[in-house]
Every structure is written in C-alpha cells, then in structure tokens.
Amino acid sequence: MSLLPHRLFLLVPPWLLDPDARDFINRVEAADGDALENGVKIAYSNFIRGCKADGIWNAIKASCILAGARTLSGALVPLVGTAPTNLNFVSGDYNRRTGLVGNGSTKYLDSNRNNNADPQNSRHIALYSSTQATTPQYYIGAGQTQAGSSLISRSDGTQSLVRLASNSTTTGSALTNGLNAISRINSSTISVRNNGNTINYANTSATPLSLNLFIFGSNDSGLNSPTSARFAFYSIGEFLDLALLDARVTDLINAIAGAI
C-alpha cells in the first residue's frame, strides 16, 4: 500500500524545522520506511534548535536519540557523527517512548567514537536513563581502571563510579532516571550530573585511552559488565554545560512521549 496519504497527513511545513533537524528526520524516515508524527518531528527540531541557542550543539560529536523513531533501525540513525554498531539488539528491545533496553549480558552498542577523539581536557559523555540496572554494571565506557579511561558505572544502589580521561575513579551519588553525565573543562576537575544536580569533583586527567566507547557496557578490549538499563539518548563529545543538556534532553523525551 502506498505511504503517500500517510506522509501528506504527517507533513510539517519545512520552515518550522531546523535545517539539521530536517536532515535528521529524512534519514530516520528512510530507515523506518515511514513518516514520523508531527509531534516527534517538532520535538527533534526543538531539541536541535534549543541546543544551538544554548551554545552546546557543536560540542555533541556522536549521538543517537534512542526514542521517537518507528523502528530500531530508525533509532540507530545518528543525530551527529558515525552510526553506532548494533551488537545483538532486536526490535523487541526498543520502545518508542522509553528507548532501548539491555540484557546485562550480550547486548551493547559500539559508538564507533574513540575515547581519544576529543581533547583530553574538554569532553563529555552522557546518557538519558529510563530504567536503572539493579546490579553493578557499566552504562557507557572505554576502559576500566586504566589511566585515561572514561566511564559511567552503577556501583550499587547508593553510589556510582565515574571516570573521564582520568587517572583515578571518582565515587558519585546513586544513578537515577534522567540524565547521567560527566563533563571535563580542565585537567583537575570533572562535573557529574545526576538526579537534576551537577556536582564538581577533583579528578586529574590522563592521556585518553585509545578504545571506542561502548554504550550498555564498557570496552575493556572487549565487552565488560554490560547493563540491563534502558536508555533513550546518548551523547559523546567535547565539554558542554550539563544542566543545559539535561533540560533539553528531558524536554525532548517528554515531548516524544506526548506525541506518540
């Protein structure tokens, strides 16, 4: 059956959408084989336009919005950068409103962005969690305890472990649903965002370990401690304001849920 009537019904006037959003939407719809709802298109556009207004868009170097698309293939279309490699996820793991869920054993994404691709003292990694793991697991990472590793890990129900091109591991608060993120602006401090709060920690940088960052686990020259959490967004890149990113991603996920 022709998709033309569906596409006409879901047409958004081009001038309402950010140019980068139009490109992203076209690629997602091509992967899905179908048009997106008006509300999803506008949510994507508002997110991109808002990130540009906040001055954080250019710092995002590798990212996927793991929500909104009609199919898993569409969800893995990169917002920015190279597409991730899907290792073992299937369509049943994907929910348009809440994102992609791991199984804690075999399923992960290779971001295809090397941990050393961003400057040692200007970088961030971020995830939007819809559901948390219940056991110690890596959410995103390259390395483990080696100097220059970068990671976000659930340690237990009361704390998290984080590194960002670091010489040592920092213990943070328990991971909660929403944005879980780290940024680094200099050689001595990292900022950790969780539960709507940003806390700065003393943490000395090191030459970034040369491994691709994995999502739903850490790349320790192979998959290490994968997670069963569910994520609706990830971002990797240069330093940015985590509070601004948090606000934009939260609005994005809420708008997608309301549009479907």
Each model region followed by its residue ranges:
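Polar, enzyme-active/binding microenvironments
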Residues: 2-260
